[in-house]
């Protein structure tokens, strides 16, 4: 991830940043409401129930920026109950919480059976819906925003909310990015388990979508495949971030722009037998914050 490294080397990386939690299995909903309302989790849930009213009252991040004189932009994942088109001045390609369900991408690979899935075949839709990978669409939108913001540079500063859906499942990336990570070079986590413990106590059943990414019991091979696709979609997203950073530099606005990078939660990706985010292990609650 050379472009994340660019951000770290030119800024500050908070290595102990955590998501406060969630009121449902869709952890991203809670974290994005916390982010956009500035509320702790116990207040963010209340605000989520009346999000449009909160926006109308000016109590959304984007509304505060508008009041401060910023021209506001948004693209990508929203997953907040207030209308993005009303929250921001310019909106392009708002996406839902995740790509459409792609059943072939789950409960795989099965041992001794052909894998029905290809993370780089556009026929499966998902991140490829529309013919262009969603991460590339988001990056292109960000470049459009920079060009538009340049026109207003002397009148208004800009605020851009650029929300990649990656690395949400189904994890898809171009073939060249998959090939960067040969399976024989991928390590299985030291905490690998064929079955995650306390599934009933933590209310994390096998039927949970996140945990259906690989079959039960887990095999080392299936975890390697899962991690290969995770690494690929992350590296592909990093490339798109690089395009945005290059565009910012070319715009001449780099030195007067603050770039913040974070995520809504972590992921298990094979640690402790888990693949998803609905648990309290470090790997699922800690987030990057640069």
Task: Tell where the protein language model's regions lie, with residue ranges.
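Formylglycine-dependent sulfatase
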Residues: 1-290
């Amino acid at each position: 991830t050379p472009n994340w490294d660019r951000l770290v080397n030119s800024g500050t990386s908070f290595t102990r940043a955590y998501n406060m939690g969630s009121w449902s299995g869709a952890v991203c909903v809670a974290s994005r409401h916390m982010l956009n309302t500035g509320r702790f989790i116990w207040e963010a849930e209340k605000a989520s129930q009346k999000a449009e009213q909160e926006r109308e009252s000016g109590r959304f991040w984007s509304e505060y920026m508008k009041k401060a004189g910023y021209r506001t932009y948004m693209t990508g994942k929203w997953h907040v109950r207030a209308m993005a088109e009303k929250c921001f001045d310019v909106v392009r390609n708002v996406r839902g919480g995740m790509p459409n369900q792609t059943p072939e991408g789950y409960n795989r690979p099965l041992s001794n059976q052909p894998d029905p899935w290809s993370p780089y075949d556009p026929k499966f839709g998902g991140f490829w819906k529309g013919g262009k990978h969603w991460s590339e669409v988001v990056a292109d939108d960000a470049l459009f925003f920079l060009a538009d913001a340049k026109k207003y540079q002397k009148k208004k500063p800009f605020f851009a909310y650029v929300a990649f859906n990656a690395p949400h499942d189904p994890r898809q990336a171009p073939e060249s990015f998959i090939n960067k990570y040969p399976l024989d070079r991928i390590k299985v986590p030291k905490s690998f388990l064929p079955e995650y413990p306390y599934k009933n106590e933590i209310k994390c059943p096998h039927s949970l979508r996140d945990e259906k990414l690989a079959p039960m019991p887990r095999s080392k091979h299936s975890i390697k495949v899962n991690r290969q696709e995770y690494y690929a979609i992350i590296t592909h997203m990093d490339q798109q971030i690089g395009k945005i950073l290059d565009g910012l530099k070319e715009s001449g606005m780099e030195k007067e722009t603050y770039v913040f990078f974070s995520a809504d939660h972590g992921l298990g990706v094979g640690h402790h037998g888990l693949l998803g985010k609905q648990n309290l292990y470090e790997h699922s609650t800690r987030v990057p914050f640069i």
